[in-house]
Amino acid sequence: MRLISLFIPLLFVLGCSKRSDSSTQIFGHAATGLNISNAIYHNNTREAIDYALSLPQCGGVEVDVRMDANGQLWLFHDQTLESSTDLNGAVESSTTAYLESGRYRSLKQEPLAALTSDLVNVLHKGKTFLDMKGSSVANKDSLLASLLSLNLDTAQFSLIVPTEALFHLFKNRFPTYLALHEFSDLSSSLLESEPELRGICIRNEKITREQVNFLKSIHKKTLIYEVRSPKGIASALNKNPEALLSDDLKLAIGLRY
């Protein structure tokens, strides 16, 4: 029984044919994936980015971005620091010096990664989606100034924003995608009146192949995330989006190429 239990999942993985007809690019979600128990490095760290960009056929990474109380940008996913680090509070209410002292509670205890010009140079090895987190419109001027100070190459860097207000803030400066909880949240008026909208970012289970094709027909792109299993990755690749933000980067690359 033990051999059979090992053999059946292997057959399933091998049975997921490579999508040679797909044009989808593979990106690392939060660099090397969120909530991965056997991850080599913690998500959104410099080490995770270096690893992801070293993999052949990796198109780049998606990383989560928050701004601290001093206007410095950081790669950090969670709303609270204590959920994954030896710090307390939130990035938005913390000083730069305080965040520089922090470490993740991971095997390698990586430091938190500030989005500096040095890290931007590393990210230039691929393309990057900056997923803007916790960014209220109240601090929009500081947020925009912090991003502009990095002199980002807009051929290499795009933004993912959670609200239409932030889309309007960034649309004339950066290629910008709107994050959606449901496909039905996408308003027809936005599609019709905003040619600057590059596309949407949405969970795999929330969009169909037909909806992806509809967006393509009006020159909008789709970024799909929350895919980590062989079945989920194959399902997402079958929809042929612009990019797949995968939580299992090596598996997604293997199934795609």
Which residue ranges define each predicted feature?
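Bacterial N-terminal signal peptides
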Residues: S5-V13
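Phosphate-group recognition and catalysis centered on beta-loop-alpha active-site segments
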Residues: C16-Y257
